[in-house]
């Protein structure tokens, strides 16, 4: 691939970088200046920014600012520079931080002390690097960091392995690389770069620049890379990658050192061996001391004597206070920290106040304050890879996944904006410019509330979100919290005061933008004499307030706006209205049994096999076996108990393997052997008795408290007597009202002769109704039942009793009914249809007409092609809206899918006359009133 470019020359101000420092395009750098140097730099634009060529360059690269500067690397005789845009000047107490963002390369034609004529070449194409070598480099980096930090190797039984690990840590090159590559901004950038190169598509020129900026390549290679063009630049880049791979694979291989170390035991006596090792260690310590002296951290004044600075235990705090201007800390906070440190120096170290104040300053120093002189890499997160990561971790949960992808898309667009913040220059009385405060970030992290029953994966989804974003993860359990100081921190006047849980999470994660999970927020303590912790959450979770969150222990504002808060709850309505209003609610429904089968095969079984020490093919379970466990051994919306059962089977297989009698296959008949008898034996029907007449029994559908659906049998028996209805079976208030509506509606139909037939037939029905005492019972009387969705079931049950006409056992129904016979929509359609399917005998279900949209949503939810799903969803909704306007119904793809998947025929009913026509296929009809009301 060739490199084509157009070039033009422009005169720009010059900023010469410190020694061995180099800027690269696409990276944001923050550099600390003293105030006079910053003013000198700003004053150079008074004439330059009016240049037409400068304006043309700014326009060509999409820059809203014309404040361009040629940043010359800190390397002798450099004829190359990086053209940067100055995003802003940020005033500190004694210094000024200038934010540069690299725009493009420049080649110096002529220069003096303050200005340079720079030739800018705009490249339109750059050859792609060898991504295999890139992936190899990232693998080497991961292996090196993992091995270097592995404390477990020090306890290894292999003496040679222990020696190799210790010698690696003694290697200066390894120590320096670990320090640089472990930095939070560098590690996050490398992680995103690995994902970007793994896609084998994208802006590789930008990715290459970011990698050269992140990795500590030699300055000669960096200069050569900056200077080169087109295909030559790729050659230099490949040399950089080859150099880094050689460092990890050869120079950091301590096997040879370990051999020499162990050979001391064989080539000399034990005493001589110990002497050699002692000399090695003493030489290291001596040279380390010289290095410390070279850095100016220690001054030796004479043999055996040290200065007071050597014994100053507050040296680290002093260094932190001296460098406060390099951190993004509130100005009031900087003043308070400096004041407290001055007070600390006046105290006696033996006093209790000294220890309290020192502990406070150490906590402040340990917080991950953002450095203003660090650079910000802007590698975009790959949405396709993020989607793959979320799908690999969790099954379903489409609404939550789509919300995370939306946030990533917005984050990518913010990263692509140039510049991030347009500098705002405010000129005073003279020619010297001053600057405004740093503007707040316009990108606010969303605050999500995942609500749903236990065990559906809310907590693990939050962890997966952190992995996808490449951020640190912290979990805070707020269930039962009854002291607001646990969140806001304790004031330092109290004995044993500590920061709040939010600040502690920042300190543990060493990041100012982690993903923080606030678990079980619906179970947080209520008002007490210690304050209301839920009210404390209002400030934390409000994007307009948490930019200045005030922790009582810290004592000055902290910016929490870049934290991604994810909250979880089981009951959404346990939260107060103000708190609920601050969060984006994402409802996670319980899994149906088909989903549990898929989750078991893809996630639970492989995970439990690994935990049991078995191979991935050591256990084989078919869908029928897994479904049996899900339906007969568990009754839950989530998968926790199901995973425990699978774990028990895997442990049983592990025992069999050790006994030499293991087989792979686990069938339905083997379940009792491994996990015992089912917790409840589900019957497909209550069964008919010998004296049952057959009528007065109807199958309803229920949505259970555990998030599942099931068949619910309604039974009615009539006795001679005055007309009344008794109800048993622990029925709730709403269900009892539905029974009264059913009784009244049937009486109304009979008294008004609305049942089709001869007058003699109608009179007989009315007489039978008026002289029958009805008893309604819903089996499983120990379980309380409530809700309006059994309205048509009870009405049909009473009508069946009066007509003495049997309702087919293969039929089930659900729907609320009104006094006028209208059938209203209900909830839990998805779960109820699955419950009808699992009953084993139902092949036809009556649903309210207005619930067709729920069937459509379930059909769309189960489509794997999300783009196609969105198109079909819009199409079906438009079609459904038109059908409702015309008063028609339609059976299309969603209904066909239900029949193919669950074996259920869906019939939609709009009023009770539709129910009768569908149940008895036209044998029983209503005439007059209700039919006329529909017309």
UniProtKB/Swiss-Prot annotation:
Disulfide bonds: none annotated. It is an enzyme of class 3 (hydrolase). SMART domains: AAA (SM00382). Belongs to the peptidase S16 family. It is found in: Peroxisome matrix. ATP-dependent serine protease that mediates the selective degradation of misfolded and unassembled polypeptides in the peroxisomal matrix. Necessary for type 2 peroxisome targeting signal (PTS2)-containing protein processing and facilitates peroxisome matrix protein import. Its main location: other. Residues 12-296 form the Lon N-terminal domain. SUPFAM superfamilies: P-loop containing nucleoside triphosphate hydrolases (SSF52540), Ribosomal protein S5 domain 2-like (SSF54211). GO terms for molecular function: ATP binding; ATP hydrolysis activity; ATP-dependent peptidase activity; serine-type endopeptidase activity. This is Lon protease homolog 2, peroxisomal. The active site is at 789, 832. It catalyses: Hydrolysis of proteins in presence of ATP. GO terms for biological process: protein import into peroxisome matrix; protein processing; protein quality control for misfolded or incompletely synthesized proteins. Residues 692-922 form the Lon proteolytic domain. HAMAP family: lonp2_euk. A motif (Microbody targeting signal) lies at residues 933-935. Its EC number is 3.4.21.53.
């Amino acid at each position: 691939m060739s490199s084509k470019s157009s070039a033009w020359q422009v005169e720009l101000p010059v900023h010469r970088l410190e020694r061995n420092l180099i800027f690269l395009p696409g990276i944001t750098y923050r550099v600390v200046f003293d105030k006079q140097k910053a003013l000198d730099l700003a004053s150079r634009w008074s004439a330059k920014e009016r240049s037409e060529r400068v304006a043309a360059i700014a326009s060509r690269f999409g820059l809203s600012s014309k404040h361009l500067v040629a940043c010359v690397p800190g390397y002798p005789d450099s004829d190359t520079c990086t053209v940067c845009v100055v995003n802003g000047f940020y005033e500190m107490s004694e210094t000024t931080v200038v934010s540069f963002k690299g725009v493009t390369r420049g080649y110096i034609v002529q220069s003096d002390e303050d200005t340079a004529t720079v030739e800018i070449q705009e490249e339109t194409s750059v050859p792609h690097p060898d991504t295999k070598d890139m992936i190899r480099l990232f693998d080497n980096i991961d292996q090196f960091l993992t091995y270097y930090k592995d404390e477990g190797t020090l306890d290894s039984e292999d003496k040679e392995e222990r020696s190799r690990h210790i010698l690696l840590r003694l290697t200066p090159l390894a120590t320096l690389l670990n320090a640089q590559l472990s930095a939070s901004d560098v590690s996050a950038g490398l992680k995103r770069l690995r994902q970007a190169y793994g896609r084998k598509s994208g802006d590789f020129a930008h990715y290459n620049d970011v990698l050269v900026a992140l990795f500590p390549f030699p300055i000669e290679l960096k200069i050569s890379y900056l200077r080169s063009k087109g295909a030559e630049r790729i050659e230099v880049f490949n040399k950089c990658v080859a150099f880094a791979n050689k460092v990890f694979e050869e120079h950091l291989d301590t096997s040879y050192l370990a051999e020499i170390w162990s050979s001391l035991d064989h080539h000399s006596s034990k005493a001589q061996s110990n002497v050699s090792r002692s000399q090695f260690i003493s030489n290291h310590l001596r040279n380390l001391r010289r290095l410390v002296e070279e850095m100016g951290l220690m001054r030796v004044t004479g043999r055996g004597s040290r200065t007071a600075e050597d014994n100053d235990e507050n040296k680290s705090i002093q260094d932190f206070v001296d460098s406060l201007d390099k951190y993004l800390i509130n100005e009031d906070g900087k003043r308070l920290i400096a004041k407290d440190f001055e007070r600390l120096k006046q105290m006696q170290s033996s006093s209790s106040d000294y220890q309290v104040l020192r502990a406070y300053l150490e906590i402040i120093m340990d917080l991950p304050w953002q450095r203003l002189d660090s650079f910000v890499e802007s590698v975009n997160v790959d949405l396709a890879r993020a989607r793959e990561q979320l799908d690999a971790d969790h099954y379903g949960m489409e609404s939550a996944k789509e919300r995370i992808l939306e946030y990533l898309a917005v984050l990518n667009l913010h990263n692509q904006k140039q510049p991030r913040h347009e500098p705002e220059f405010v000129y005073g009385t003279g020619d010297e410019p001053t600057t405004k405060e740093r503007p707040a970030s316009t990108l606010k992290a969303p605050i999500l509330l995942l609500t749903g029953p236990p065990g559906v994966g809310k907590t693990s989804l939050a962890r997966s979100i952190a992995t996808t974003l490449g951020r640190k993860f912290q979990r805070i359990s707020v269930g039962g919290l009854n002291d607001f100081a646990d969140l806001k921190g304790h004031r330092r006047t109290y004995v044993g005061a500590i920061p709040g849980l939010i600040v502690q999470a920042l300190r543990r994660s060493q990041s100012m933008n982690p993903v923080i999970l606030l678990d079980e927020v619906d179970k947080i303590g209520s008002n007490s004499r210690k304050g209301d912790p839920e009210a404390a959450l209002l400030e934390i979770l409000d994007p307009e307030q948490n930019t200045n969150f005030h922790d009582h222990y810290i004592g000055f504002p902290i910016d929490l706006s870049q934290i991604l808060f994810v909250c979880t709850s089981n009951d959404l309505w346990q939260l107060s209205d103000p708190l609920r209003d601050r969060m984006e609610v994402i409802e996670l429904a319980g899994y149906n049994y088909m989903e549990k089968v898929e989750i078991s095969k893809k996630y639970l079984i492989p995970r439990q096999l690994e935990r049991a020490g078995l191979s991935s093919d050591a256990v084989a379970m078919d869908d029928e076996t897994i479904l049996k466990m899900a339906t007969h051994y568990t009754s839950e919306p989530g998968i926790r108990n199901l995973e425990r059962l699978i774990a028990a089977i895997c442990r049983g297989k592990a025992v069999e393997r050790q006994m030499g009698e293991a087989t792979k296959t686990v069938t339905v008949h083997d379940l009792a052997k491994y996990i015992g008898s089912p917790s409840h034996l589900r019957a497909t029907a209550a069964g008919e008795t010998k004296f049952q007449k057959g009528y007065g029994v109807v199958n309803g559908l229920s949505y259970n408290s555990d998030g599942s659906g099931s068949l619910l049998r309604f039974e009615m028996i009539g006795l001679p007597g005055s007309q009344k209805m008794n109800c048993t079976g622990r029925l709730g208030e709403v269900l009892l009202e539905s029974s009264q509506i059913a009784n009244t509606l049937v009486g109304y139909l009979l008294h008004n002769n609305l049942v089709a037939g001869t007058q003699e037939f109608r009179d007989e029905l009315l007489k039978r109704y008026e002289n029958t005492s009805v008893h309604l019972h819903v089996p499983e009387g120990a379980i309380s039942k409530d809700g309006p969705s059994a309205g048509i079931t009870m009405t049909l049950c009473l009508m069946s009793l009066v007509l003495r006409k049997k309702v087919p056992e293969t039929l089930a129904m659900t729907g609320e009914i009104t006094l006028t016979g209208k059938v209203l929509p209900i909830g839990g359609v998805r779960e109820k249809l699955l419950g009808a399917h699992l009953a084993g005998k139902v092949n036809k279900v009556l649903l309210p007409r207005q619930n067709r949209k729920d069937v459509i949503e379930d059909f769309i939810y189960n489509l794997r092609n999300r783009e196609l799903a969105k198109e079909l969803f819009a199409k079906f909704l438009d079609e459904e809206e038109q059908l409702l306007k015309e008063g028609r119904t339609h059976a299309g793809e969603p209904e066909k899918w239900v029949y193919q998947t669950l074996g259920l025929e869906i019939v939609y009913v709009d009023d009770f006359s539709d129910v009768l026509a569908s149940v008895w296929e036209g044998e029983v009809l209503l005439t007059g009133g209700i039919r006329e009301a529909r017309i």
